[in-house]
A protein has these predicted regions:
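Hydrophobic anchor residue at the start of the ABC signature
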Residues: 88
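Conserved catalytic motifs of ABC-family nucleotide-binding domains
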Residues: 95
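Catalytic Walker B motif of ABC-type/P-loop ATPase nucleotide-binding domains
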Residues: 99-102
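ABC transporter nucleotide-binding domain
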Residues: 115-199
Length: 199
C-alpha cells in the first residue's frame, strides 16, 4: 500500500486526471488484427481526440522510432516482437510523463529483446520508464534506479550502482526446496558448501 504521485498529482483509482500522464504496455498487447500498424495508431489517435495533422505526424514519428515505419502488413501477421514495438508506439502516443511496461521483453528472442531495450533506452530522455522484469541483464542495461520485490514487498531499492557495490560478493547463498535439489547442486558444484538445513 502507499501513494503514487505522477507529475505532482496523486493517482486515485477510478479518476482519470492522472491518466493523461501515463502510457502503459501490457505483457501481451492486443490489437485489431485486420488493421496495419499505421491504421491502428491513427485509430488510437482519433479516439483520444488528436487533431488530424498532429495525429498523422505523431504516428509517423512513432512508427519510425519503433522500426515499423515501412510496415504495410496487417497486424495479424506480426511477430511477438513487432507487436511489442507497436505496443510501445501506442503507449507513447499521448506523450506520457511515465511509461509503465509489464515484462516488455518476456518471450522474445535475443534480437527482439535487444530491439525493445534499444527503444526503451532511446525514449528515456523523453519520459520516465518503469518496467517489471525477471531478466537481470535487462535491468543492468537500461536502469538507473531499481526495486527488488520479495513476495510483493520491496526488499531492496535504490541506485543500481549503489546496490551492486553494497551487495558485491564472491559467495552466493541458495535455498533449495528439497533434498533432491540439494543433491543436484552438490553434483553440479562440487566445491559448494552446505551451511545449514531447515527442518
Amino acid at each position: 500500500s502507499g501513494e503514487i504521485i505522477v507529475n505532482g498529482e496523486k493517482v486515485v483509482y477510478g479518476q482519470t486526471t492522472t491518466k493523461r500522464y501515463i502510457g502503459y504496455l501490457p505483457d501481451v498487447p492486443e490489437f485489431y488484427p485486420f488493421m496495419t500498424a499505421a491504421e491502428y495508431l491513427h485509430f488510437c489517435g482519433e479516439i483520444t481526440g488528436m487533431k488530424r495533422t498532429e495525429n498523422e505526424e505523431r504516428c509517423k514519428e512513432l512508427l519510425e522510432l519503433v522500426g515499423l515505419g515501412n510496415e504495410t502488413h496487417h497486424i495479424k501477421g506480426f511477430s511477438r516482437g513487432m507487436k511489442q514495438r507497436l505496443g510501445i508506439a501506442q503507449a507513447l502516443l499521448n506523450r506520457p510523463k511515465l511509461l509503465i511496461c509489464d515484462e516488455p521483453t518476456s518471450a522474445l528472442d535475443p534480437v527482439g529483446r535487444k530491439e525493445i531495450l534499444d527503444i526503451l533506452l532511446a525514449i528515456r530522455e523523453q519520459t520516465t520508464v518503469l518496467f517489471s522484469t525477471h531478466i537481470l541483464s535487462d535491468v543492468e542495461r537500461i536502469c538507473t534506479d531499481v526495486a527488488f520485490l520479495n513476495n510483493g514487498v520491496v526488499g531492496v531499492q535504490g541506485k543500481l550502482s549503489d546496490i551492486k557495490t553494497r551487495y558485491r560478493s564472491e559467495e552466493y547463498q541458495l535455498e533449495t526446496g528439497n533434498d533432491t535439489d540439494m543433491l543436484i547442486l552438490q553434483q553440479t558444484f562440487p566445491n559448494m558448501q552446505q551451511i545449514g538445513r531447515n527442518q
